[in-house]
Structure formats: structure tokens, C-alpha cells
């Protein structure tokens, strides 16, 4: 599991694209020239940006070679760069930085977010969506299984919180619109939940384990999911998935 799997990620393409569409709908910009899609993945969010601003110069950034290859194949009219978001520097100030479900993987948001604002031009926008599920059973159980089986903690850090992000971005000279939404995804089985998180949140926990260790981990994780997520009357499962949205516009 050394690289991201675009096919596995896109298995839930509609569910993953919906937050990006809802974030994009709140971006208060019309005619823009330079856009960066941070953590573009296989290009599903980049395609939305290209559809809204077909004349803009859009650059997708991702650290995964597999994701970049998939994005380039899908969107030949956009530019894609394999790079670490923290180190990438645009050639010019940006009108929009779009980051859908990517910044939660990076540490030090108190430094990262002001840095991203500094890459914007006057009245440019930073639009961010991050899964806020650190306390959801899906992610709590990952940590519990790892503790039970004596594996190191490889989960990401929790988000800083609504009030912290508001202060960080206000102090960086932005007007801030921030909200939180919980989606309830209809899952056909507990295995489907595992399929969902294996493409994202579960990756760090499994990537350094042997095949046997991975199977042991997933078997126990499946058992614990069954305890936490009861079946609905029709046999499906409702997976609560909270997400934090931020649209910050420079006032300078």
C-alpha cells in the first residue's frame, strides 16, 4: 500500500464529489485566471473547477504518482504537478486555492493556513473541506484495534476546531465563512464501510503491516464496526460522515 489507489478511491466517486460541489458553490468568484487544486487526487475536484472556469489556468497538486497519472489522463487541458502541498510554490499569486479533503493529512495548521493565504492575490479565496470524523466510530475503532494488536498509532491529528480556524484565518487578513455538515451515506454492508475507509483513513494503519497482519486487523475492525453500526430496517447502514467547510477571502 505504498501509493494511493485511484480506482478504489473513485469507487465512491459520487459521495466524495458531493462535498466538493457544495464547497465550490460557496466560492464568491466569477472571472478568475489562476487556480490551484491542492490534493487533487484523480482529478474529480479539478474537473468541477474546470467546468466552472474553463478559461482559467488550473493546476492540480498531489504527492501520489498514481493519482497524478489518473488526473492527467482524465483532464488533458489542466496542468498537474506531483509535489508536497507544503513545499509547492505557484509561479504567480492565485485567485483561488481549492483543497477538498486533503489538508487534514497535513500537520501544523496554525502555520499551514496562513502560508496558503499568502499565496493568494488581493481578494483571492482559500476554499477548504476536511473530514471531521476523528471522533466517529470509524476512526475511533482504528485506534482501538491498533492498540489491541500492539501496533503504533498512525492516524492523523484531529482538526484544530471551528473557533481555531476562524481565528487563524481572520488574523491572516481574511473574511471567513465556516460551517459543518454531517452526511449520512447509505452503505449496503459493514464491508462497504471498510472499502470506503481503506481508500483513505485506514491507509496509514495498514501500509506497514504484512498481509497476514492486515487481515488480522481488518477482521477485528469488521467485528467492531458491526457492534457500532446497526442495520436499518431495510438491511442498509447509515454512515455518519461530518465535514468541515471553510471559505476564506483575503480583504487586502
From Swiss-Prot:
Enzyme class: transferase
GO molecular function (one): trans-aconitate 2-methyltransferase activity
Keyword Ribosomal protein attributed: no
CDD domains assigned to the protein according to its UniProt record, in alphabetical order: AdoMet_MTases
Enzyme Commission number, as recorded: 2.1.1.144
SUPFAM superfamilies found in the cross-reference section: S-adenosyl-L-methionine-dependent methyltransferases (SSF53335)
Main location: cytoplasm
GO cellular component assignments: cytoplasm
Subcellular locations according to the entry: Cytoplasm
Keywords: Cytoplasm, Methyltransferase, S-adenosyl-L-methionine, Transferase
Reaction catalyzed: trans-aconitate + S-adenosyl-L-methionine = (E)-3-(methoxycarbonyl)pent-2-enedioate + S-adenosyl-L-homocysteine
Entry similarity comment: Belongs to the methyltransferase superfamily. Tam family.
Protein name: Trans-aconitate 2-methyltransferase
Species assigned in the record: Escherichia coli O7:K1 (strain IAI39 / ExPEC)
Gene that encodes it: tam
Amino acid at each position: 500500500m505504498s501509493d494511493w489507489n485511484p480506482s478504489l478511491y473513485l469507487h465512491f466517486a459520487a459521495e466524495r464529489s458531493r462535498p466538493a460541489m457544495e464547497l465550490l458553490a460557496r466560492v464568491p468568484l466569477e472571472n478568475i485566471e489562476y487556480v490551484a487544486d491542492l490534493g487533487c487526487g484523480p482529478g474529480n475536484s479539478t474537473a468541477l473547477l474546470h467546468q466552472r472556469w474553463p478559461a482559467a489556468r488550473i493546476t492540480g497538486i498531489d504527492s501520489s504518482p498514481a493519482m497524478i497519472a489518473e488526473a492527467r489522463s482524465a483532464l488533458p487541458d489542466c496542468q498537474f504537478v506531483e509535489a508536497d502541498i507544503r513545499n509547492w510554490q505557484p509561479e504567480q499569486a492565485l485567485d483561488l486555492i481549492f483543497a477538498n479533503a486533503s489538508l487534514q493529512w497535513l500537520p501544523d495548521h496554525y502555520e499551514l493556513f496562513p502560508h496558503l493565504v499568502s499565496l493568494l492575490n488581493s481578494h483571492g479565496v482559500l476554499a477548504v473541506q476536511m473530514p471531521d470524523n476523528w471522533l466517529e466510530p470509524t476512526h475511533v475503532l482504528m485506534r482501538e484495534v491498533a492498540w489491541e494488536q500492539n501496533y503504533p498509532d498512525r492516524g492523523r491529528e484531529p482538526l484544530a476546531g471551528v473557533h481555531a480556524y476562524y481565528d487563524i484565518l481572520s488574523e491572516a487578513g481574511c473574511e471567513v465563512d465556516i460551517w459543518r455538515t454531517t452526511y449520512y451515506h447509505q452503505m449496503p454492508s459493514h464491508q462497504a464501510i471498510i472499502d470506503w475507509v481503506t481508500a483513505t483513513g485506514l491507509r496509514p494503519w495498514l501500509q506497514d503491516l504484512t498481509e497476514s497482519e492486515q487481515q488480522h486487523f481488518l477482521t477485528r475492525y469488521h467485528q467492531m464496526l458491526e457492534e457500532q453500526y446497526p442495520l436499518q430496517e431495510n438491511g442498509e447502514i447509515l454512515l455518519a460522515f461530518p465535514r468541515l467547510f471553510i471559505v476564506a477571502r483575503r480583504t487586502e
